[in-house]
UniProtKB/Swiss-Prot annotation:
Lineage: Archaea, Methanobacteriati, Methanobacteriota, Stenosarchaea group, Methanomicrobia
Species in which this protein is naturally found: Methanosarcina barkeri (strain Fusaro / DSM 804)
EC number from the UniProt entry: 4.2.1.20
MF terms (GO), sorted A to Z: tryptophan synthase activity
Enzyme class: lyase
Alphabetical list of Pfam families matching this protein: Trp_syntA
Positions of disulphide bridges: none
Protein name: Tryptophan synthase alpha chain
Oligomeric and partner information: Tetramer of two alpha and two beta chains.
Pathway as given in its UniProt record: Amino-acid biosynthesis; L-tryptophan biosynthesis; L-tryptophan from chorismate: step 5/5
Amino acid sequence: MERQKISEKFSELREKKEGALICYVMAGDPSAEKTGEIVKALVNGGADIIELGFPFSDPVADGPTIQVAGQRSLAAGMDTQRYFELIKNLDVGIPLVCMTYYNPVFRYGVEKFVEKAADAGISGLIVPDIPVEEAADLKNSCEKHGLDLIFLIAPTTTEGRVQKILERGSGFLYLVSRLGVTGAREDVSSSTRELLSRVETGLPKAVGFGISTGEQAAEVRDAGADAVIVGSAFVKIIDEGKDVNERLEALAKELKSGIKRAS
């Protein structure tokens, strides 16, 4: 299907002087059919970009909420072929980003995985466990098929590595707002502000890991972020299984209005 490029989405939002809301959910949790409804609810709530997690049995960067979501997805039969079919069937008109660990990409074949991702309508790829120094093959395949390769930068990332990421990354930069794994937390840390001011780039800066309220989203936007990434707070609602779509849409609306208020 026709896919919107991430850069197009950010240009569109920049014209409106608006920040982006990037929503993460695990593909196939609790089922492929339900994922379609979940994505629609998030889009209705104001999501600008959707990140769809690819489940993996050893998710080193994920907090407990997302780990359990991955287990549910795998138990429901999610695999590479079904993942791409699911993506192909999503007709949402906004960029879709695949978040996956490197092992499934490597096992499937880097070139083949990226080609299938592009064919399915994916605009970008996030692979949190591949160092930028080892990502040449992946980067080449992404460039060949028109996908953005998005890297993570943490407060502990060295200056040398930050420079390599700025040279090789595209789409947006994923800034990790605190140390440790993903999960909803209470306040926006000073390390987030320091990281935003430290990284100088023309690429949009998206802050993730730990944001769960409109207030936090507004704070992150005020601190200089171009986008806010929210995952665990949505996955928790899916996990609870009660009034899921209504609550997802309501939370997305709250987050988006926080981002708009700060803009």
